[in-house]
Amino acid sequence: MVTTQPPEILGLLSDPLRWQLVVELGRSDRRVGELVQLVGKPQNLVSYHLAELRRTGIVSARRSSADGRDVYYRADLFRSRDLLGEAGHTLHPGLSLAPSPRDTVERRRARPRLLFLCTGNSARSQIAEALVEHRSAGTVEARSAGSHPKPLHPNAVRVMAERGIDISDRPTKSLTRFARNRFDRVITLCDKVREICPEFPGAPIAAHWSIADPAAAGDTDKATYPAFQHVADEIDSRVTLLLADLETRPLERTHRA
């Protein structure tokens, strides 16, 4: 009789605390102190399990650009999907992860409204807004703004043009412009903006994507362009997951300005 060990991912996520941590990080990037409050466990225990999750690559970490003493954790949901898919294949080659059912009636009834925020509204939030509009084919309404708007970065225009999306004529906007508007979700892409993000009417769902400023990666547009490509790829991956979430789960709130 041949015995086999179950795939590591199954043992890793069978722990209730690790599962809860991945679920929370799938919703928003978090600092360890926030995770401690959310799961109600001691920090040393949470840190231990985060280290185990990082070892397999389904959780990663980056130093906060707002405060270098802080670290933001994020879940790599595509990595989780791949590992779980491999586990299903190990059980039987005919098994695969089935897509979640789509509630098309609910999707047609409510058009989600999203607001993306960063410091300058010159790159990250603009990229996110454009990708949502493009990938949702207009079924999701997206807006973007910054705490201290500055001109659109030429590398943001270039990296989106390579994806067939023209953002060259988009204005940059201050977040105060949307202070009285209602959104279903408000997503910060900058650690600094997260610290000062105001409350919006109707208490929209808030999430944070801790993404480094690509313009800070070098002194010239040529030097920073690889960082812009990396950031655009990361935002595109997150937008793909966000749109899937909006498609498969009924909106908890439906707001209009």
Each language-model region and where it sits:
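Alpha-helix C-terminal capping/helix-to-coil transition sites in glycosyltransferase folds
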Residues: R180-R182
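Phosphate-binding/catalytic loops
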Residues: C197-A257
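Short, hydrophobic-biased segments on the C-terminal half of alpha helices
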Residues: L50-A51
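Short glycine-rich anion-binding loops that position phosphate/pyrophosphate groups of nucleotides
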Residues: G120-S122, D191-R194
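Beta-hairpin "wing" of winged helix-turn-helix
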Residues: R55-A66
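N-terminal helix-turn-helix DNA-binding core of bacterial DNA-binding proteins
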Residues: T4-L45, D70-F78
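Conserved active-site segments centered on acidic
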Residues: R102-T176
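Amphipathic alpha-helical dimerization/coiled-coil segments
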Residues: M1-Q5, F78-F116
